[in-house]
Regions:
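Ubiquitin-like/PB1-type beta-grasp interaction modules and other compact soluble beta-rich domains
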Residues: 1-89
Length: 90
């Protein structure tokens, strides 16, 4: 069980990294932030770059602790949350 005070580790890849201006940040969101969707809304308010990164959520994918996640996926202290563009194969 993670320490209730442990921050979330947020990873940004590709153009999300460029728009937010960072590849990694450690954040402690408000206790009311319990899902990926709530986290995205909170992160979008951190800066203009964050708002731009999350402006079109159809082009953003997420993983929590290296498992693909949906907006309703729960997040909590100590989790690693990664944001990246859709992956394509060929």
């Amino acid at each position: 069980m993670a320490d209730a005070e442990a921050p979330l580790t947020i990873l940004y890849f590709a153009w999300l990294r460029e728009r937010t201006g960072t590849s990694l940040e450690s954040v402690t969101p408000p206790a009311a932030v319990r899902t990926v969707g709530e986290l995205v809304a909170w992160l979008a308010g951190r800066s203009a770059g964050h708002a731009l990164a999350f402006a079109n959520l159809r082009t953003v994918r997420c993983a929590v602790n290296q498992d693909f996640a949906e907006p309703a996926t729960r997040v909590g202290p100590g989790d690693e949350v990664a944001f990246f563009p859709p992956v394509t194969g060929g």
